[in-house]
Amino acid sequence: MREAMQLVPMVIEQSSRGERSFDIYSRLLRERIIFLNGEVNDTVSALVCAQLLFLEAENSKKPINLYINSPGGVVTSGLAMYDTMRFIRAPVHTLCMGTARSMGSFLLMAGEAGGRAALPNASILIHQPSGGFQGQASDMMIHAEEILKTKQRMTRLYAEHCGRSYEDFERGMDRDRFMTAEEALEWGLIDRILTVREGEIPD
């Protein structure tokens, strides 16, 4: 069962040189589309950062599209992706399809201003970072202080990217806050809700 779930579709293209096959993600990468699908961790972060850097090297002006369907995960892994998104010169447009929770929502709102979107039935969650530690009391206090610093840093970044006050997000992230696409738009996490593909005229 696990092997079946890990199957990746292949795409076959015809050219003057014959047939070429690509896994679907490599083919989409050629279209400057990166998928963040699943938990945020060091492995996923390394892959996404590498793809961002590769696409910037190919064209530093053309937008990169980051499609997000993630329950969140490791804060430091997410911050590595955030910093890379902000570091490269190519603008990164973000789109939530499915869910963007915790660090997933953080990366969603970190996209280029005007280029952050969600599909109509997307679910977005913001909350304060969490962590656990066992050990001596003095070490636990050090880790608690570090978590508090991370919370303050992330709250400030949410406020800056979303155009709201620090206090708004401090209150909003005190507990789990689930949002519809419409609520995420109101909070400034996204700039628009996509109901049709851009450039298409609805029936």
From Swiss-Prot:
Q: Where can this protein be found?
A: Cytoplasm
Give the enzyme's main class according to its UniProt record, as a single word: hydrolase
Question: What are this entry's molecular-function GO terms?
Answer: ATP-dependent peptidase activity; ATPase binding; serine-type endopeptidase activity
Q: What keywords does the record list, in alphabetical order?
A: Cytoplasm, Hydrolase, Protease, Serine protease
Q: Name one GO biological process term.
A: protein quality control for misfolded or incompletely synthesized proteins
Q: Where are the active-site residues found?
A: S102 (nucleophile), H127
Looking up CDD domains in the UniProt record yields: S14_ClpP_2 (cd07017)
Q: What's its catalytic activity?
A: Hydrolysis of proteins to small peptides in the presence of ATP and magnesium. alpha-casein is the usual test substrate. In the absence of ATP, only oligopeptides shorter than five residues are hydrolyzed (such as succinyl-Leu-Tyr-|-NHMec, and Leu-Tyr-Leu-|-Tyr-Trp, in which cleavage of the -Tyr-|-Leu- and -Tyr-|-Trp bonds also occurs)
Q: What is its main location?
A: cytoplasm
* Gene Ontology CC terms, in alphabetical order: cytoplasm; endopeptidase Clp complex
EC number, as in UniProt: 3.4.21.92
User: Which InterPro entries does the entry mention?
Assistant: ClpP, ClpP/crotonase-like_dom_sf, ClpP/TepA, ClpP_His_AS
Taken from the record, one Pfam family name reads CLP_protease
- Subunit and interaction comment: Fourteen ClpP subunits assemble into 2 heptameric rings which stack back to back to give a disk-like structure with a central cavity, resembling the structure of eukaryotic proteasomes.
Protein family (similarity comment): Belongs to the peptidase S14 family.
Task: Describe the task this protein carries out.
Answer: Cleaves peptides in various proteins in a process that requires ATP hydrolysis. Has a chymotrypsin-like activity. Plays a major role in the degradation of misfolded proteins.
Q: What is this protein called?
A: ATP-dependent Clp protease proteolytic subunit 1
